[in-house]
């Protein structure tokens, strides 16, 4: 990222830090846009179809982290109950609380230390929820259940799931401060 107000800014060069130490302040000041941060989330790993899909999704409508109030309330409630949860698990929780039906399958198989994925029964769930579940599992414990390249194809990952996964990746990478971007976007409109 380039941030002229940062003490680590060196004219014309990108910041050498892996994480912006001023992100919270930059969000509060309104100098970081959610769409820009979303594009940077994938870094140099984006191939053309994913670049195209990301551009189309971000231009279609304003980005929203949560599907609605019920999703926000579920995530907030369980995140607060599991104090000390890692950013990875908080991002996985974000995905798994998006749908009430999926959440009911997961509810008894997690705590602040993580998820017991092998114990979760998925038979009969909608394919869209399966991709959300696999993304949550990948974010939480690693692996290649779903890979960056899969996100480029709407046949594999629906638009709704794509937006949720993007939100989870931002949450995992930058922490809860990115949720303030949604509020800033809403205030601007």
Regions inferred by a protein language model and the residue ranges of each:
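Extended, charge-biased low-complexity segments
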Residues: 1-126, 137, 141-189
């Amino acid at each position: 990222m380039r941030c002229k107000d940062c003490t680590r800014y060196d004219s014309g060069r990108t910041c050498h830090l892996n994480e912006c130490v001023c992100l919270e302040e930059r969000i509060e000041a309104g100098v970081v846009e959610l769409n820009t941060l979303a594009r940077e989330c994938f870094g140099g790993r984006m191939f053309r179809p994913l670049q195209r899909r990301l551009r189309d999704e971000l231009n279609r409508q304003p980005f929203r982290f949560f599907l609605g109030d019920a999703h926000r309330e579920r995530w907030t409630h369980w995140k607060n109950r599991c104090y000390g949860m890692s950013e990875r698990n908080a991002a996985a929780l974000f995905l798994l609380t998006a749908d009430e039906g999926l959440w009911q399958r997961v509810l008894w198989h997690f705590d602040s230390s993580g998820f017991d994925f092998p114990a979760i029964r998925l038979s009969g769930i909608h394919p869209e929820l399966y991709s959300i579940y696999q993304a949550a599992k990948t974010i939480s414990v690693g692996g290649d259940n779903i890979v960056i390249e899969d996100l480029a194809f709407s046949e594999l990952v629906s638009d709704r799931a794509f937006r949720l996964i993007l939100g989870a990746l931002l949450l995992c990478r930058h922490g809860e401060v990115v949720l303030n971007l949604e509020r800033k976007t809403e205030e601007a409109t």
